[in-house]
Structure formats: structure tokens, C-alpha cells
């Protein structure tokens, strides 16, 4: 089998933090997920590798072994990765991994040994515009989900005939003795199910399910943000007993060219020409719900902020709203003509000593420095 590096598979640095590993796993698992790459053997293989890499690198003990000794170090301790295991076994492992990545929101019922060969909960990304996320919307989506094969009743075996796994005796675990220590690991033959398929179901080729599609209209609440999860009850995969999991929509929000969001607060850069600074002014600025009047006092500093209470994003869990923060950005001309130069020089002279603050500020400093070297 072709060797591969776990860090390269997840496209991360070897110094990556646990959070970075989790984020990279989620990205790569979504990229190569079987629901997105139907019939692609290359994506199937990459999906296995991504999960193998995550199982090792997300475990501090396994990661230290791998960093120091490579895969040989893992194998010497009884960790066999996905060697000799089928694709459905890999997919079944996603239950525990999804729990760690998405915060434990996925049902554990779908991972019982008597359940189907796949997690009943379904996750997919949902792209939203800035406006859709701020104000909420109705969204038409198409989902692809698994339904238990009617011929084998979701077992994957011809006529539903299942045998006890001879390697683990139905326990789902095998034991490896190393010196005085005995380690238990998931049976590589049955993937922990304790069962074996002697002859595959011809209709589903042993998968235990068939793929289906469904169009849905989902309600997006006001105030959702990137990485928020929206749960749609009973719209996930369907198990062999008719039980259906939940659909989890992982939100991705497009950035806006003018407004910048941070939590429920909105930031807006307000360009202010330099000649206006000593005078002050009143401006009309855009807000999420229309326009606001911003009074800028004389001698406002660059990056100074003005806060408009309750003009931000409505909190997704309550009626409370964030703030709009208008931040001044002083703008200078890229170039000036002769007439403008003359006017500026005349203006500077009109301030007298005040127009040359550096002269008074450095008074006596030059003589002091000369004294250091005399």
C-alpha cells in the first residue's frame, strides 16, 4: 500500500494545534465525503486516509508515537489504522469523529452494533450571503441521503443472513499481548460489529443502503454566522428499522465589501478627508437597516470609533442586538497640484509657530546631542 504522511493528508503543519487539526479534518472530510463524490474510487481512498490521519493526530498519545517513530511506532503498539478494513467500516467510524468535531451533536443511537453501517446524522455545508445570514431567509436545498436496502433490510448480506465474526467471536474486539501488557482494539475483520457477511446482497453490493435525493425548504434564522449549525429534525439518513437521523447544516457566510462582522457587532470604515479633520463635520453613513447620522467633532483622530447601540446583528438565540461601530479612516490626497500646494503652504504659515511644532519640540535637543560627543 502506498505510504502517506498524516500531516500532508490534512494539509497542516507538524506544529498544528488540536483546534487546527480538527478544522483541517472537517474541511478535508467534507471535500472527499462519499455523498459529494458518488462513484469516485479516488475520493473514497482519500476519505479513508483523511479519517485515519485524524484518528491518529487528534489523539495526543498516538500523535507523539507517530511524530517520533512514524507508522511503525503505531503498529508496534497495536494501532493498525485502516489496514484491511472496508470502506463501510471507515464510514462507521465517523460517528465518534463527528462528535468530536461538531461538539457532540450527533446521535449515538446510529452507532450501536445492531444499527446500520453508517451514522444516521447527515452533515452538509450551507453557503449564505451576508444579507441572508443577517436577516434570515427561506432556502431551497437538495440533500442526498442513505436509506436501508429493502432487499437485505440494511444488513448488506444476501437475504439478510449474518454470521458471527470468527476472528473476535462476536465481541467486536481482539486482544494483542505485548510483554506483560494486553491491549484491546477494534476487530479489523468486522470493524467492531461482531458480525460477518458471508455473501453480499446483490442489490446494494453489501453496502446495506441505497442513495436517495430530496428537495427541502429550510428556514434560516436571523443572525446565523459561519460555523453555526442548523439542525433539521429527521432529515438525515434512514436506518434499517425506519429510524431517521437529523440533518446538520454547517453555515458558511460570504463576506461583505463594506460591513465587517465580529460576533453580533458590525464594523464600518468611514473615510474622512484630512482637511475636514480640524473642522469636524456631520455625515450620513449606511447601516444594516438604512442610514445613520454621524457627528464627527473637530480634531478627530485616525481610527477613532463611534458606537451606535443596537444597530448590529440580532442575536440568533435572543432578541438582543449588537452594535454598529463606525471607525474613522483619515484620507490624504495621492498628489497635489501647484495651486493646492500654495494654499497648503499659506495655511501652514498662517499658524505661525503652531504650524511648525517640531521646532519647539526639538528646541535644545541638538545642542544636547553635540555635548555628548564633545
Curated annotation (Swiss-Prot):
GO cellular component term, pick one: cytoplasm
UniProt cross-references to InterPro entries, sorted A to Z: DnaJ (IPR012724), DnaJ_C (IPR002939), DnaJ_domain (IPR001623), DnaJ_domain_CS (IPR018253), HSP40/DnaJ_pept-bd (IPR008971), HSP_DnaJ_Cys-rich_dom (IPR001305), HSP_DnaJ_Cys-rich_dom_sf (IPR036410), J_dom_sf (IPR036869)
Binding site for Zn(2+) 1: 149, 152, 201, 204
Assigned keywords, A-Z: Chaperone, Cytoplasm, DNA replication, Metal-binding, Repeat, Stress response, Zinc, Zinc-finger
SUPFAM superfamilies with a match to the protein in the record: Chaperone J-domain (SSF46565), DnaJ/Hsp40 cysteine-rich domain (SSF57938), HSP40/DnaJ peptide-binding domain (SSF49493)
GO MF, one example: ATP binding
Binding site for Zn(2+) 2: 165, 168, 187, 190
SMART domains (alphabetical): DnaJ
Cysteines paired by S-S bonds: none
Zinc finger (CR-type): 136-213
Compartmental location: Cytoplasm
Ranges where the J domain occurs: 5-70
CXXCXGXG motif repeat feature ranges: 149-156, 165-172, 187-194, 201-208
Cofactor names: Zn(2+)
ATP-binding is among the record's keywords: no
Note on how the cofactor is bound: Binds 2 Zn(2+) ions per monomer.
Free-text domain note: The J domain is necessary and sufficient to stimulate DnaK ATPase activity. Zinc center 1 plays an important role in the autonomous, DnaK-independent chaperone activity of DnaJ. Zinc center 2 is essential for interaction with DnaK and for DnaJ activity.
Role played: Participates actively in the response to hyperosmotic and heat shock by preventing the aggregation of stress-denatured proteins and by disaggregating proteins, also in an autonomous, DnaK-independent fashion. Unfolded proteins bind initially to DnaJ; upon interaction with the DnaJ-bound protein, DnaK hydrolyzes its bound ATP, resulting in the formation of a stable complex. GrpE releases ADP from DnaK; ATP binding to DnaK triggers the release of the substrate protein, thus completing the reaction cycle.
SUBUNIT field: Homodimer.
Protein name: Chaperone protein DnaJ
Amino acid at each position: 500500500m502506498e505510504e502517506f504522511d498524516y500531516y500532508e493528508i490534512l494539509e497542516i503543519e507538524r506544529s498544528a494545534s488540536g483546534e487546527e487539526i480538527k478544522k483541517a479534518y472537517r474541511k478535508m472530510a467534507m471535500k472527499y465525503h462519499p455523498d459529494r463524490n458518488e462513484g469516485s474510487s479516488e475520493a473514497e481512498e482519500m476519505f479513508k486516509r483523511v479519517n485515519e490521519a485524524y484518528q491518529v493526530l487528534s489523539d495526543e498519545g498516538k500523535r507523539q508515537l507517530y511524530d517520533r517513530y512514524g507508522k511503525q511506532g503505531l503498529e508496534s503498539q497495536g494501532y493498525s489504522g485502516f489496514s484491511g478494513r472496508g470502506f463501510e467500516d471507515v464510514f462507521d467510524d465517523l460517528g465518534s469523529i463527528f462528535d468530536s468535531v461538531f461538539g457532540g451533536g450527533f446521535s449515538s443511537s446510529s452507532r450501536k452494533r445492531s444499527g446500520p453501517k453508517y451514522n444516521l446524522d447527515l452533515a452538509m455545508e450551507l453557503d449564505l450571503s451576508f444579507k441572508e445570514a443577517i436577516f434570515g431567509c427561506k432556502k431551497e436545498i437538495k440533500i442526498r441521503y442513505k436509506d436501508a436496502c429493502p432487499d437485505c433490510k440494511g444488513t448488506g448480506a444476501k437475504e439478510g443472513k449474518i454470521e458471527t465474526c470468527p476472528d473476535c467471536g462476536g465481541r467486536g474486539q481482539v486482544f494483542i499481548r505485548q510483554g506483560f501488557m494486553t491491549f484491546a482494539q477494534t476487530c479489523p475483520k468486522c470493524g467492531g460489529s461482531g458480525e460477518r457477511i458471508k455473501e453480499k446482497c446483490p442489490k446494494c453490493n453489501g453496502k446495506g443502503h441505497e442513495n436517495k435525493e430530496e428537495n427541502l425548504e429550510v428556514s434560516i434564522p436571523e443572525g446565523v454566522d459561519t460555523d453555526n449549525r442548523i439542525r433539521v429534525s429527521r432529515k438525515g439518513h434512514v436506518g434499517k428499522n425506519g429510524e431517521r437521523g437529523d440533518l446538520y447544516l454547517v453555515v458558511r457566510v460570504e463576506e461583505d465589501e463594506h460591513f465587517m462582522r465580529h460576533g453580533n457587532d458590525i464594523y464600518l470604515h468611514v473615510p474622512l478627508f484630512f482637511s475636514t479633520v480640524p473642522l469636524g463635520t456631520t455625515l450620513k453613513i449606511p447601516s444594516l437597516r438604512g442610514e445613520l447620522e454621524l457627528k464627527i467633532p473637530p480634531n478627530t483622530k485616525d481610527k477613532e470609533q463611534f458606537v451606535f447601540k443596537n444597530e448590529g446583528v440580532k442575536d440568533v438565540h435572543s432578541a438582543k442586538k449588537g452594535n454598529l461601530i463606525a471607525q474613522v479612516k483619515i484620507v490624504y490626497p495621492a498628489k497635489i497640484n501647484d495651486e493646492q500646494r500654495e494654499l497648503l503652504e499659506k495655511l501652514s504659515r498662517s499658524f505661525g509657530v503652531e504650524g511648525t511644532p517640531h521646532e519647539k519640540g526639538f528646541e535644545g535637543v541638538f545642542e544636547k546631542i553635540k555635548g555628548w560627543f564633545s
